[in-house]
């Protein structure tokens, strides 16, 4: 019999022992889990739910293809195309087919202005995007200037959309934080983030998506150090893997969870990075997470244990609590 208080102290208040009604398998139930940074055109999304992921956020894809998806599990929120400076990242990348980026040529807020900030935000919104993805990658080409970034953020907020930024290169984290970007697509990895910027990011309720495990060497260390400082200051961290970048299996990543734990995001806070429904207000309805077998005895066992999770219909779960 699992001690409910001990289980919830380890994994959070919405966790409980349960079994599958159809075959009697015992395990642990949790809310639906989300990967907040994927690229669906580079992965087999059918593999996500059997490996624990009930919701994803696609942060850069063809808005036409994304708009024509059928509603299913995993639930998909998306940004549509990257908005970038002329000649900027990710244009020309072998993994970035035509149609997944738009070049913003002016900060114009005039409706329908060719290449204008408002026009391109509106295009993504009309294709059903709930977030806007901007590229601020000074390490790989031109970047949006402050006026254009400000115009994109303003138009997106008018449309009720979050703005997510890829920040890479000198000064890019500062540019994003000082100009109202809501979410960083990666914990900043190319330079240390100064304390004043961490404080400002937390004060403005910015979120950072982890993606620690895609890095190695100095980039990984900088990302982990920056994320640890952000989390320690009270910042909101979201679990994300940049799935599709490199050869990673779909599903809950033990490597990403271990990296988060090493950065000080542990226990219920770690689970919270996965169960946060952002950008939605609520998690997917009608499904839950089931992890077969006994739960871990300590926080260090969570990553490998949670990597065996699967998505199940909520009606198939029977609580074991008494």
Model-derived regions: residue spans:
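Glycine-enriched alpha-helix->loop->beta-strand junction motifs that scaffold or abut catalytic
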Residues: 52-53, 128, 177-184, 202-208, ...
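Short acidic active-site motifs
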Residues: 43-45, 119-120, 171-173, 193-197, ...
């Amino acid at each position: 019999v699992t001690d409910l208080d001990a289980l919830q102290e380890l994994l959070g208040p919405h966790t409980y022992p349960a079994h599958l009604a159809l075959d009697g398998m015992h395990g642990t139930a949790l809310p639906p889990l989300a990967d907040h940074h994927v690229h669906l055109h580079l992965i087999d999304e059918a593999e996500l739910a059997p490996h624990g992921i009930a919701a994803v956020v696609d942060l850069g894809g063809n808005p036409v293809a994304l708009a024509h998806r059928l509603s299913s599990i995993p639930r998909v929120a998306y940004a549509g195309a990257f908005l970038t400076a002329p000649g900027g990242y990710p244009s020309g990348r072998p993994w970035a087919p035509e149609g997944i980026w738009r070049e913003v040529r002016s900060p114009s807020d005039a409706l329908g202005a060719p290449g204008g900030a408002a026009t391109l935000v509106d295009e993504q919104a009309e294709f059903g995007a709930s977030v806007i993805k901007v590229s601020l990658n000074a390490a790989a080409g031109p970047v949006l200037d402050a006026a254009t970034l400000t115009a994109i953020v303003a138009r997106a907020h008018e449309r009720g959309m979050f703005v997510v930024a890829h920040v890479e290169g000198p000064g890019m984290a500062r540019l994003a934080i000082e100009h109202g970007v809501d979410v960083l697509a990666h914990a900043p990895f190319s330079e240390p983030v100064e304390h004043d910027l961490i404080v400002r990011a937390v004060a403005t309720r910015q979120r950072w998506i982890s993606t620690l495990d895609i890095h190695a060497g100095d980039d990984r260390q900088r990302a982990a150090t920056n994320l640890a400082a952000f989390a320690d200051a009270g910042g909101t961290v979201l679990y994300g893997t940049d799935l599709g970048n490199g050869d990673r299996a779909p599903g809950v990543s033990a490597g990403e969870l271990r990296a988060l734990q090493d950065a000080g995001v542990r226990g219920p806070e770690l689970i919270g990075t996965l169960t946060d429904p952002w950008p939605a207000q609520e998690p997917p309805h009608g499904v839950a997470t089931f992890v077969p077998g006994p739960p871990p005895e300590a926080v260090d066992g969570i990553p490998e244990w949670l990597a065996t999770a699967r998505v199940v219909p909520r009606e198939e779960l029977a609580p074991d609590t008494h």
